[in-house]
A protein has these predicted regions:
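A short, hydrophobic C-terminal helix/tail in secreted or cell-surface proteins
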Residues: 180-184
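Active-site-adjacent "lid/gating" segments in soluble enzymes
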Residues: 6-153
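Rossmann-like NAD(P)-binding element
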Residues: 1-5
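Aromatic-enriched alpha-helical interface/lid elements that frame and gate functional surfaces
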Residues: 136-179
Length: 184
């Protein structure tokens, strides 16, 4: 939790006086500043407040936690990247630095184009199951043998799907399906 190491006399400002080359990393639920900085941070809270739970799950369903501790995992990866960048900077400058990562920030970053779309349009994103907003078809589909995943991530793959799997080359040039959005 932010502030604990300072109370123990082991905060970054104290340690950098002893060793100016120190790289000091901290991971918390909500960062060192702001209204929630003293609150405990758990993965499920980071997933909820970072927006991930609002876009995970079935369309029209309840907010759903990702199947793994994604906030914890991404927080660890982000702090690792920060430490490596700080080591590289120290090689150049000779100085250490503080690396601060919050689980919530990591989850916001993981929402990628969904967060950007909200900022751009003001529309609140909703869960869409296995679909992906920028690519279509990209989903699980029921077929005679059970379920199949189709992910035509670009036009070349879409054309291959139409020609070789669906045997429907007419769908490639049909105005209804010329770009990913109408294919939904």
């Amino acid at each position: 939790r932010p502030g604990v190491m300072d109370k123990l006399g082991l905060g970054y400002d104290v340690l950098k006086e002893i060793n100016p080359r120190i790289i000091y990393a901290a991971v918390s639920g909500f960062g060192c500043y702001g209204p929630y900085h003293l609150r405990p941070g758990y993965d499920i809270l980071a997933q909820a407040m970072g927006g991930m739970m609002s876009i995970t799950g079935s369309k029209g369903g309840e907010p759903t936690r990702a199947g793994s501790a994604l906030g914890d995992i991404l927080g660890g990866l982000h702090v690792t990247i920060g430490i490596l960048a700080a080591v590289n900077a120290r090689t150049i400058t000779g100085k250490g630095q503080r690396v601060d990562v919050s689980l919530m920030d990591s989850m916001i970053a993981a929402t990628e184009n969904t967060a950007l779309k909200y900022i751009e349009t003001g529309n609140i994103p909703a869960p869409m199951g296995n679909r992906y907003a920028a690519v279509s078809p990209y989903d699980s589909f029921t077929c005679k043998g059970g379920k199949v995943i189709i992910a035509a991530g670009n036009q070349k793959l879409y054309e291959k799907l139409c020609n070789e799997v669906l045997e429907r080359p007419d769908m490639i040039t049909c105005l209804l399906y010329t770009s990913p959005s109408p294919r939904d």
